[in-house]
């Protein structure tokens, strides 16, 4: 984890080319130890900086010429013994030349893996036709915005965010007809 916040002053106060900026860079790399919390993961790869940081505060030529940076923070959770899982992440792509940001915050996916809702807990006799019906579920939520660095927390940017929600519920079954033909109807909702 590293945070740098240089105060930049170019030229003399009162001159037409005078510039004063407070720049910063946040750099963070993290990966959770899988043994720390079984069933969940957390990782972060953050390199977030103001657009003037590379121009006025870079410590190497490569850093000064770098125009694109990106950051991602991710979390996922699986509930052991259940069909449920959740993943969430956020990402930011920056262009220091134009001072623009592309933000995806949050992206969330909730899954329910394949299960048989009509299957009896204790099978007695022959399997019924409806016990072969399986279901899955996937729900996705995405939210994104593009804005200038100086406008990112404005009311207008928040109002212009693009967001969407998507459901996927496949229902299927497989039946054996005359011991030679497999019939597998599927419905997607």
Model-based region annotation:
Residues 1-189:
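Outer-membrane beta-barrel proteins and related beta-barrel translocases across Gram-negative bacteria
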